[in-house]
């Protein structure tokens, strides 16, 4: 069952995460939270530069909107001691990367069918150089099958807060999140060329919100 309103464990986790991020980042900029609707299905699509990205989003968006974010995350992380428990408490369900994971796709469709918020990183992995990569078709297929609005979310600076391969976080000068306008896509879900087109339009919407150095 997907999450709508954040349970106590998620609220406590978000509060701790926000406290920790405020201590590490000298400046935090968040724009456009008001663009996330208070109810109904929503797909959040974003660029992925650090494993902290979903934590940053959840710690600011969930308290402000009162809505839990159900995340698609890598399946192997769900098996890590303590980390897997933390992820499940925070609405993450696993996706096997490199293959079509029908079970995860059905779970994602269930989140939207229940009228809840789904968060996806369509690149499928973190960027190695900070620049936004190619979006895979899965998020586009979910958008077309569900009819849910898609909201682009651009994050920058989190890769400095916790660099790839680092064991511990570092101080960061500035981290930023910009939330764009919602958009609905009306192509047929069975139209393969349309899937690639929608995926590229999603990517372009996120890229337009990013600082120039993060754009392709």
For each predicted feature, which ranges?
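A transmembrane-helix-recognition feature enriched in membrane-embedded lipid enzymes
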Residues: 1-31, 38, 56, 67, ...
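Non-catalytic C-terminal accessory region of glycerolipid acyltransferases
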Residues: 1-9, 102-216
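Active-site phosphate/pyrophosphate- and oxyanion-stabilizing loops and adjacent acidic/basic residues
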Residues: 18, 59, 140-141
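Short, flexible loop segments at the rims of nucleotide/cofactor-binding pockets, characterized by
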Residues: 19-25, 94-98, 129
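A generic local structural motif
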Residues: 28-32, 57-58, 105-107, 163-165
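A short beta-turn/loop motif at secondary-structure boundaries
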Residues: 34-37, 169-170
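Catalytic core of membrane glycerolipid acyltransferases/transacylases, capturing the structured
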Residues: 38-99
């Amino acid at each position: 069952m997907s999450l709508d309103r954040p349970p106590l464990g998620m609220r406590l986790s978000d509060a701790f995460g926000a406290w920790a991020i405020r201590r590490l980042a000298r400046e935090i900029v968040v724009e456009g939270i008001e663009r996330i609707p208070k109810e109904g299905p929503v797909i959040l699509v974003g660029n992925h530069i650090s494993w902290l990205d979903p934590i940053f989003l959840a710690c600011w968006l969930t308290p402000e909107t009162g809505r839990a974010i159900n995340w698609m995350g890598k399946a192997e992380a769900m098996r890590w001691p303590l980390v897997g428990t933390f992820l499940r408490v925070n609405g993450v369900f696993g996706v096997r990367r490199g293959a079509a994971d029908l079970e995860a796709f059905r779970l994602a469709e269930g989140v939207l069918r229940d009228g809840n918020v789904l968060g996806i990183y369509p690149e499928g992995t973190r960027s190695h150089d900070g620049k936004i990569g190619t979006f895979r078709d899965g998020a586009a297929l979910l958008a077309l099958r569900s009819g849910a609005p898609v909201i682009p979310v651009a994050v920058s600076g989190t890769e400095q807060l916790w660099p790839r391969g680092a064991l511990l976080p570092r101080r960061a000068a500035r981290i930023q999140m910009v939330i764009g306008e919602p958009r609905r896509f009306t192509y047929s879900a069975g139209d393969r060329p349309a899937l690639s087109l929608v995926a590229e339009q999603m990517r372009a919407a996120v890229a337009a919100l990013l600082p120039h150095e993060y754009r392709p």
